[in-house]
Regions:
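Solvent-exposed, non-transmembrane regions of membrane-associated and secreted proteins
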Residues: 2-261
Length: 261
């Protein structure tokens, strides 16, 4: 009787699907898809979610493949629920650079981000931002692996946190916590450095930050130092890749390389 009741409740919660299945008989709607996504999914079955960034007043659908005018989920990120790091590539219309490129604008801006899958909503708070090269040639054949979806080992997590703090344009009071924090990487274009990407970093269920101090020695890709005729103080640290767990029991590990991205 209890099982039957649960089944009945579950069926009633998704009763709206009957209408859409009748209207779109050739569409295979995922089990559990929310009603607010059904019409969009019927027209574009590569839809995997939605992103809303209050700080730049952007809201748009997320697709599983890149297309002009839409956000896209990284190929290594799960569409079902947040990974340790979920990466979303934004269209040009989402001007996150203007909202989060300085400590002053960051503090004044709404730092909230709502990342929605077809099944649930997840709230993030931006904690920092940085520039990364789009082409490996602009940083000695290297691209910082910010979009690592698999869980890192504790030591790799510490190294990753250090890598981020050096790259952040400013540092808030937030300290990343291993085995607790999940991150979102919002990757947009840059009008300041057209050859680079601008990346805003958010933490799941994080609180708005009220303090931020400009980083006086930002780690940029090598091309920035070349263009500005400066010596790169971080030149000996280029080439870091994380060690991640390769099994669900977290007993086996693997060191990633450029081929994994």
């Amino acid at each position: 009787p209890v099982a039957n009741a649960v089944t009945a409740v579950s069926a009633s919660k998704t009763a709206y699907l009957r209408q859409y299945k009748k209207e779109y008989p050739d569409v295979d709607f995922p089990a559990g898809i929310r009603e607010s996504f059904c019409e969009q999914y019927a027209g574009q079955s590569s839809t995997v979610g939605k992103i809303a960034i209050a700080g730049c007043e952007y809201s748009g659908w997320i697709l599983s493949t890149k297309s002009i005018g839409n956000a896209a989920l990284d190929k290594n990120s799960s569409a079902e629920e947040p990974d340790w790091i979920t990466t979303v590539y934004l269209p040009q219309s989402a001007n996150i650079e203007k909202a989060f490129s300085s400590s002053e604008s960051y503090i004044k801006t709404d730092q909230g981000v709502v990342y929605s899958t077809l099944f649930n909503d997840y709230n993030y708070n931006i904690i920092g931002a940085f520039y990364v090269n789009a082409n490996a040639k602009d940083d000695g054949g290297y691209v910082f692996p910010y979009n690592t979806a698999k869980k890192m080992t504790g030591s790799s997590f510490s190294q990753f946190s250090d890598e981020l703090s050096h790259r952040f344009l400013y540092n808030s009071d937030y300290k990343l916590k291993y085995n607790k924090d999940k991150l979102i990487m919002l990757v947009g274009s840059s009008s300041v450095y057209p050859d680079f990407k601008f990346v805003a970093v958010g933490v799941l269920n994080g609180k708005a930050q009220v303090n931020a101090k400009a980083n006086d020695q930002i780690q940029y890709p090598q091309a920035w130092y070349d263009k500005n005729n400066q010596s790169n103080p971080y030149r000996f640290s280029i080439g870091w890749y994380p060690t991640v767990y390769s099994d669900s029991s977290e007993k086996e590990t693997a060191v990633l390389s450029a081929r994994d991205y």
